[in-house]
Amino acid sequence: MDIISIGWVSLMVVFTFSISLVVWGRSGL
Protein backbone atom coordinates (compact mmCIF):
# COMPACT_ATOMS: atom_id res chain seq x y z
CA MET A 1 0.00 0.00 0.00
CA ASP A 2 1.20 3.50 -0.75
CA ILE A 3 0.84 6.52 1.52
CA ILE A 4 -2.24 7.76 -0.35
CA SER A 5 -4.15 4.52 0.26
CA ILE A 6 -3.15 4.46 3.93
CA GLY A 7 -4.30 8.07 4.30
CA TRP A 8 -7.70 7.36 2.72
CA VAL A 9 -8.25 4.23 4.84
CA SER A 10 -7.37 6.04 8.07
CA LEU A 11 -9.62 8.96 7.07
CA MET A 12 -12.58 6.64 6.42
CA VAL A 13 -12.00 4.84 9.75
CA VAL A 14 -11.97 8.14 11.67
CA PHE A 15 -15.04 9.40 9.79
CA THR A 16 -17.01 6.19 10.44
CA PHE A 17 -15.96 6.23 14.11
CA SER A 18 -17.12 9.85 14.47
CA ILE A 19 -20.51 9.06 12.90
CA SER A 20 -20.91 6.08 15.25
CA LEU A 21 -20.20 8.27 18.29
CA VAL A 22 -22.77 10.85 17.13
CA VAL A 23 -25.42 8.15 16.55
CA TRP A 24 -24.76 6.55 19.96
CA GLY A 25 -24.87 9.97 21.64
CA ARG A 26 -28.23 10.84 20.09
CA SER A 27 -29.57 7.40 21.06
CA GLY A 28 -29.00 8.41 24.69
CA LEU A 29 -26.25 5.87 25.42
From Swiss-Prot:
InterPro entries: Cytochr_b6-f_cplx_su8_sf (IPR036143), Cytochrome_b6-f_cplx_su8 (IPR005497)
Top-rank taxon: Eukaryota
One annotated GO molecular function: electron transporter, transferring electrons within cytochrome b6/f complex of photosystem II activity
Keyword flag Coiled coil: no
Coiled-coil residues: none
Membrane topology, as annotated: Single-pass membrane protein
GO CC field: chloroplast thylakoid membrane; cytochrome b6f complex
TM spans (from-to): 3-23
Subcellular location: Plastid, Chloroplast thylakoid membrane
S-S pairs: none
GO terms under biological process: cytochrome complex assembly; photosynthesis
Function: Component of the cytochrome b6-f complex, which mediates electron transfer between photosystem II (PSII) and photosystem I (PSI), cyclic electron flow around PSI, and state transitions.
Family from the record: Belongs to the PetN family.
Protein name: Cytochrome b6-f complex subunit 8
Gene source species: Staurastrum punctulatum
Primary gene name: petN
